[in-house]
């Protein structure tokens, strides 16, 4: 939970530095989604705000690794997992948003959206399939089922062109 708070705090602090108001914070199966008035931001600034969450997790890990304490291992592990998961190129995760922003900045909004949707759908199907494979191989791990189903739902939304925080 602390890793998630630090992650969202990273987004929040950068948005505040850019003078952007945060409208809401919603928690869902894939994590939390912060809604802000980012329409005023340029692609590079929004990219910085998007990557600030994973960056905060990495900074937190670096700070904790200064002390050689085994009691911090779970916190470091949770922060690394959250960072890596959020960098997957699946909308609405930070990685999917970053992919959209980079391609939109270089090639325009339509190309950015198309690239982010197709890449995100492929990655979401691979993630969901991989998680179901792990569940089948281990004969359990049912705690992975909600994440796998959410990944398949994200792929369906991306392929069917439903609105996903763009």
PLM feature spans:
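Hydrophobic transmembrane alpha-helices and their immediate loop junctions
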Residues: 1-166
């Amino acid at each position: 939970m602390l890793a998630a708070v630090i992650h969202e705090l990273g987004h929040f602090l950068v948005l505040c530095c850019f003078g952007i108001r945060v409208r809401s914070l919603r928690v869902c199966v894939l994590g939390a989604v912060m809604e802000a008035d980012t329409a005023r931001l340029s692609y590079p600034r929004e990219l910085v705000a998007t990557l600030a969450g994973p960056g905060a997790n990495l900074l937190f890990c670096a700070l904790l690794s200064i002390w050689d304490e085994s009691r911090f291992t779970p916190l470091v592990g949770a922060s690394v997992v959250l960072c890596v998961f959020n960098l997957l190129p699946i909308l609405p995760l930070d990685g999917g948003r970053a992919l959209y922003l980079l391609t939109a900045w270089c090639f325009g909004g339509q190309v950015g959206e198309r690239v982010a949707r197709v890449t995100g759908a492929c990655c979401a199907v691979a993630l969901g399939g991989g998680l179901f494979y792990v569940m089948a191989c281990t004969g359990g791990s049912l705690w992975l089922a909600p994440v796998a189903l959410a990944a398949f739902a994200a792929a369906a939304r991306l392929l069917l062109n439903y609105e996903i925080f763009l």
